[in-house]
Amino acid sequence: MADFEDRVSDEEKVRIAAKFITHAPPGEFNEVFNDVRLLLNNDNLLREGAAHAFAQYNMDQFTPVKIEGYDDQVLITEHGDLGNGRFLDPRNKISFKFDHLRKEASDPQPEDTESALKQWRDACDSALRAYVKDHYPNGFCTVYGKSIDGQQTIIACIESHQFQPKNFWNGRWRSEWKFTITPPTAQVAAVLKIQVHYYEDGNVQLVSHKDIQDSVQVSSDVQTAKEFIKIIENAENEYQTAISENYQTMSDTTFKALRRQLPVTRTKIDWNKILSYKIGKEMQNA
């Protein structure tokens, strides 16, 4: 073991540790971090070398965070990354410091947002919050209005999770929706992601994603927001239904094909008869 450690550079150790961390299942970051910490056995190297992995994990997972003094939770995403460890809360028009290891927000400060997109962002945010409240009991959302390559763009992010470590499973839903304000019709692009980990007496993961392409009629901000939400609702319902139907098909066909219906003799075993034979034989030998 010592020879192996001598051959592996600190840079390579950090690279391996970062891979483990960024691939941690939802709700299991702390467990993976603690295991990696034991393996690496160098806290300074881990914190300094793998800090980017902590940030990448939280942004990839759309980690929700509560900011003291504000009611709504905001999602940690690449779209809200302001640099230097600060993130944007576009709903409350503030920025805040985020500790990627402790997953805590601090130092909220007023933050200017793009005024040209304020009405559009607010309309989409209001409509999306109502949708998430109806469809995701544990869901959160954050909507951004940004100029990307000179085009005014709305980006809507949704996150919902269920962490049940006592029942040996954790899961998370993520979806990201974008459209550019270009009348009369705007292209809508999205990616939907599901990740579930079940680990009682085994280790099974569901990792699924689907890309969406659609279009929305651009009129007023409020009406466009309504049409945008209709597209989101239809696509996400179809995706969840398809996942459920796929599992039912697998249960009815694939999983059944994995086990033999009859033994090699092609004859069913009468276990009751075998048991009576065994009892009779034991009585004879008594």
From Swiss-Prot:
Belongs to the F-actin-capping protein alpha subunit family. InterPro entries: CapZ_alpha, CapZ_alpha/beta, CapZ_alpha/beta_2, CapZ_alpha_1, F-actin_cap_asu_CS. It is found in: Cytoplasm, Myofibril, Sarcomere, Z line; Cytoplasm, Cytoskeleton. The keyword Cytoplasm applies. Signal peptide: none annotated. PROSITE patterns: F_ACTIN_CAPPING_A_1 (PS00748), F_ACTIN_CAPPING_A_2 (PS00749). One of its GO terms (biological process) is barbed-end actin filament capping. Pfam families: F-actin_cap_A. Present in all tissues examined. Transmembrane segments: none annotated. Keywords: Actin capping, Actin-binding, Cytoplasm, Cytoskeleton. Component of the F-actin capping complex, composed of a heterodimer of an alpha and a beta subunit. Subunit of dynactin, a multiprotein complex part of a tripartite complex with dynein and a adapter, such as BICDL1, BICD2 or HOOK3. The dynactin complex is built around ACTR1A/ACTB filament and consists of an actin-related filament composed of a shoulder domain, a pointed end and a barbed end. Its length is defined by its flexible shoulder domain. The soulder is composed of 2 DCTN1 subunits, 4 DCTN2 and 2 DCTN3. This is F-actin-capping protein subunit alpha-1. One of its GO terms (cellular component) is cytosol. GO terms for molecular function: actin filament binding. Gene3D superfamilies: F-actin capping protein, alpha subunit, F-actin capping protein, beta subunit. Its main location: cytoplasm. The keyword Acyltransferase does not apply. F-actin-capping proteins bind in a Ca(2+)-independent manner to the fast growing ends of actin filaments (barbed end) thereby blocking the exchange of subunits at these ends. Unlike other capping proteins (such as gelsolin and severin), these proteins do not sever actin filaments. May play a role in the formation of epithelial cell junctions. Forms, with CAPZB, the barbed end of the fast growing ends of actin filaments in the dynactin complex and stabilizes dynactin structure.
